[in-house]
Amino acid sequence: KSGLLVIDEAHCISTWGHDFRPDYRRLKNVVEILPRGVPVLACTATANTQVVDDVTEIVGIDSISRGPLRRDGLELQAARLGNAERLVWLSTNLPTFEGSGIVYVLTKDDADKVALWLKEQGISAEAYHSDVDALHRPEIEKRLLDEEIKVVVATPALGMGFDHPRLSFVIHYQTPQSVIHYYQQVGRAGRKLENSFGVLFKGSEDEEINQYFIETSFPDEEKTREMVRFFEDAGGWVQRKDVLSAVNARLGAIKKMLTHLVVQGAIEKIGGKYRRTLNSWDFDSEIVREITNRKQVELSKMKEYVNESGCLNLFLLKALDDPYVSECGICQNCSGEYLDLSLDRPLVNKAEKFLKKNYGIISPRLRSIPQDERNDSGRFLSKWGRGLGVQVKEVKDNPLVGFGDELVIASQDLIENDWNPEPSPSWVAVVPSKSLSSELEHFAIRLAENLDIPFVNDAITQKPGNYQPQKTMQNEFFQRRNVENRFVVSGNVPRGPVLLIDDVVDSKWTFTVIGMQLRRCGVEAVYPFALADAKGGE
């Protein structure tokens, strides 16, 4: 027997909400089958009038109770700083703050990077995002609750369900998409403290990242229609791997499309299988355009916030349609007390070098690859569009620029001092490229000279054909098919360990397929090396 249905985080029901989750839409069906007279209570801490109206209509709520949003004692500040300057500001000021807090970032890569910098500066910090082991995340939360660590550097993955009554500060390393996103996160500070503060920084990379999130917040119309046609042609139950093999989209996008189609009744799911229903379906492109435009307006509002000369609290509350608004008297614009942005120049230089050394490991693909044909562990020099990856992006955009000496020297330093693979490479080869073949070869020749090993020209060639760029292949089924039977390895290549160079790595399938052929020719070890890692960097 149902006495009361409580829906927490009710903003997730609304397509206008900052954290819309399609599965929450199924609650409408639950409400409709409740016994007559069973009350429904929908709760949310952060929602503007549009979200409230949407939730009210969907759930069928008769009355609305709305309290004031302002958090007394929460001092707000905002400023613009470059990447290196933000790192230095954090490492300089965090040790002076009482208690513990959160630094919010937009991407998993930034969470890892900022946490690593803080650790190297002697600050107790942990990264927190969806790729952190699920068993480790509760441990990080508890250590933050117990104030055993100074700061957690987190994506919005540290969100719903986390309640720390004594957080002293919340700092945003980058600007979130909307006022609702921001207020939900900064509002975690000082819930049981008299005084707390929130600092928002705007960086040059914010716009590109937020635009990507907005553009990918809904499934792609063409891909969704393609998926529905696949289900119609299949005529029965299929698994997700079958969908991945048929629709050229990333796994995350496939999951999102499947969820939307199930909620919309276009397909049904039982266990791990899906099939088309008899229900009519069409892609609602009008609502997608409307919501996307609204998100652009919300992003513009956050740009205004950074430049706001009046009360910052008042600005946020008005944007959230709070009827109980007044000036706070304690934000930077009310008090006249602004952030101290003076920074130690040698430390900024150190941070700039740290950002350029944004390298990582290229783990070999193991599944379905025979053990004696697998690559060894490789390295990438940078993240796409970050640090030295900015130079790689410039060459991809304009090949005439060429890969400069700084990339050669940095690659040599990484290979000889940080990586030092054993047994060491005895020759160098490059992945054939239609667009950057000569530029990549010129880079490889200079690097080989610095490493004092030979560069073997034409060790690997590409068969004639009209091949699609690998970057357009969105999941492993398409990525592997696109490079299989595409390359030829010369039968008389050296048998010693090889440093196999490509400009950019994403899926690792190009390295994997060429590596398999090299190993079949008797090459002792294949070490992949890429100038930039583009995975997750779009």
What is each PLM-predicted segment?
Residues K1-R229, K241, I267-R276:
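Helicase motor core with emphasis on the C-terminal RecA-like subdomain
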Residues K108, V132, A429-L440:
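Acidic, metal-coordinating catalytic cores used for nucleic-acid/nucleotide bond scission
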Residues G67-L69, S130, A429-V431, F455-Q468:
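A short, structured active-site edge motif that brings together acidic residues
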Residues S335, K350, F354, T512-E538:
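PRPP-dependent phosphoribosyltransferase catalytic core
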Residues D54, H442, R446, V513, ...:
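Active-site signature of alpha/beta-hydrolase-fold catalytic machinery across serine-
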Residues D112, V504-I514:
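Acidic, divalent-metal-coordinating active-site segment for phosphoryl/phosphodiester hydrolysis
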